[in-house]
């Protein structure tokens, strides 16, 4: 049986429903960006028993990263498959500044979603409270990078207006991490990036547009790219076939 409310009450019911959804959206945004704390990062990477960053992210030693530069996707796949990790490889990338040397690094993640005004307002408010007022949200995660990190961004495959970085932010990424960039989305200013010696980006596309209508909802949180689950502290290893994301304890 269908219920029918009096017409004069309908608008108030809609308002109440909207307010409830807004509250849920704000809480969801802060659950990832504001309160995904050190303890939660340790919990989701509990098999790692080595050194960790201040925020709880696993820190695989440099000597291990160096050895992984010679590992092929097939070799990594065999080990991962044997341990039950069947969804750690993602292919079909475009490479900006391709080179023979493979990118290997400790993953720092960023999660973006299509912009929603109510949630984005609260994210920007929190950013302002933290002093992040002079640059866009895409720069927030770049500020966290350390040498040996590799930034992995889920821009939900957005190409037009999904350009996470141009040559200026690419320079900032390389200056801080001495490493590259992986984006499930796009970049711009490729001609400028070609002048950054040692920098490389793996992207799903390129576009001249500026980043627009997206919001950052998580830094160093679990993300998904294609059929791959990626955690902060994983080790990203590139080769001509694509990118393998290796759990740190393996």
Which residue ranges define each predicted feature?
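Feature captures the catalytic cores and cofactor-binding loops of soluble hydro-lyases/lyases
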Residues: 71-75, 80-232, 245-250
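Channel- or pocket-lining gating/hinge segments that regulate access to a cavity or pore
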Residues: 235, 241-244
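Buried hydrophobic positions in well-ordered alpha/beta secondary-structure cores of metabolic enzymes
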Residues: 56, 173, 234-236
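N-terminal secretory signal peptides that target proteins for export/translocation
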Residues: 1-11
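Bacterial N-terminal signal peptides
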Residues: 15-27
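N-terminal pre-domain segments of enzymes
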Residues: 32-77, 81
């Amino acid at each position: 049986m269908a219920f029918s409310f009096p017409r004069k009450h309908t608008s108030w019911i809609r308002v109440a429903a909207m307010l409830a959804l807004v509250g849920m959206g704000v809480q969801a945004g802060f659950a990832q960006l504001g309160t995904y704390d050190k303890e939660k990062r340790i919990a989701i990477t509990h098999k790692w028993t080595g050194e960790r960053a201040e925020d709880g992210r696993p820190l695989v030693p440099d000597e291990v990263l160096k050895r992984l530069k010679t590992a092929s996707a097939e070799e990594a796949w065999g080990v991962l498959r044997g341990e039950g990790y069947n969804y750690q490889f993602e292919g079909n990338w475009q490479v900006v500044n391709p080179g023979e040397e493979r990118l290997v690094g400790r993953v720092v993640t960023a999660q973006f979603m299509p912009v929603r005004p109510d949630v984005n307002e609260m994210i920007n408010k929190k950013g302002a409270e933290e002093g992040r007022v002079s640059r866009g949200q895409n720069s927030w995660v770049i500020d966290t990078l350390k040498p040996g990190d590799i930034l992995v961004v889920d821009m939900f495959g957005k190409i037009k207006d999904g350009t996470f970085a141009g040559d200026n932010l690419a320079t900032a990424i390389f200056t801080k991490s001495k490493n590259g960039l992986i984006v499930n989305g796009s970049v711009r200013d490729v001609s400028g990036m070609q002048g950054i010696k040692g920098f490389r980006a793996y992207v799903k596309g390129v576009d001249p547009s500026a980043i627009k209508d997206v919001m950052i909802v998580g830094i160093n949180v679990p993300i998904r790219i294609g059929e791959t689950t990626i955690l902060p502290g994983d080790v990203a290893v590139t080769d001509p076939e694509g990118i393998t994301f290796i759990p740190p304890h393996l």
